[in-house]
Swiss-Prot record:
Pfam families: Pribosyltran. It comes from Rhodococcus opacus (strain B4). One of its GO terms (cellular component) is cytoplasm. Belongs to the purine/pyrimidine phosphoribosyltransferase family. Its EC number is 2.4.2.7. One of its GO terms (biological process) is purine ribonucleoside salvage. It comes from the Bacteria. The keyword Glycosyltransferase applies. It is found in: Cytoplasm. Its main location: cytoplasm. The lineage of its organism: Bacteria, Bacillati, Actinomycetota, Actinomycetes, Mycobacteriales. This is Adenine phosphoribosyltransferase. Homodimer. NCBIfam families: PRK02304.1-5 (NF002636).
Length: 177
């Protein structure tokens, strides 16, 4: 198993917590301070890249996953696809709706033009909460013909049960709270 201690230290030290955001009862993990710290960002990207060194494509989840996904793809020499929130891409798109801890949403990727068929994909995002977003992302890229070889996140909020929802996928979280 890869040692992620430098990444864990950076995330633990730099994460900003916001209670009752974006709505009452939700505790939001803001990783922006981790990303804005050059060393913190570097060790986090390196740790996420170590999760699946042979992946062909990174599926980066809108929006903070974009920051991580681009870095991980660059580190691995792989491609990256931005998994967008609904309405951000021109048609045709593939879409997947899901429930998250404070509402519902839909994710989209371009239909047919990004060549995912048969390719290995690592899904990357910042936080695992209920698992709705990551499950929808995995199902979405699978609907495009990709093989999801793993999911990697910076921070997992264990009490929200996301890991159980993602049980069929190998999952790495750098920090679990």
């Amino acid at each position: 198993m890869t040692d992620h201690s430098a990444a864990r230290d950076a995330v633990t030290r730099l994460t900003r917590w916001a209670d009752d955001f974006p709505q009452p009862g939700v505790r939001f993990a803001d990783l922006t301070p981790v990303f804005s710290d050059a060393d913190g960002f570097r060790v986090v990207v390196d740790a996420l890249a170590a999760c699946a060194p042979a992946t062909e494509v990174i599926a980066a989840v809108d929006a903070r996953g974009f920051l991580l996904g681009g870095g991980v793809a660059r580190e691995l020499g792989s491609g990256v696809v931005a998994v967008r929130k609904s309405g951000k891409l021109p048609p045709p798109v593939l879409s997947q709706s899901y429930t998250l801890e404070y509402g519902t949403a839909t994710l989209e990727i371009p239909a047919g033009s990004i060549g995912l068929d048969g390719r290995s994909v690592l899904v990357v995002d910042d936080v695992l909460a209920t698992g709705g977003t990551l499950d929808a992302t995995a199902r979405l890229v699978e609907s495009a013909g990709a093989r999801v070889i793993g999911i990697a996140v910076v921070l997992e909020i264990a009490a929200l049960g996301g890991r159980e929802r993602l049980g069929k996928y190998p999952l790495t979280s750098l920090v679990t709270v």
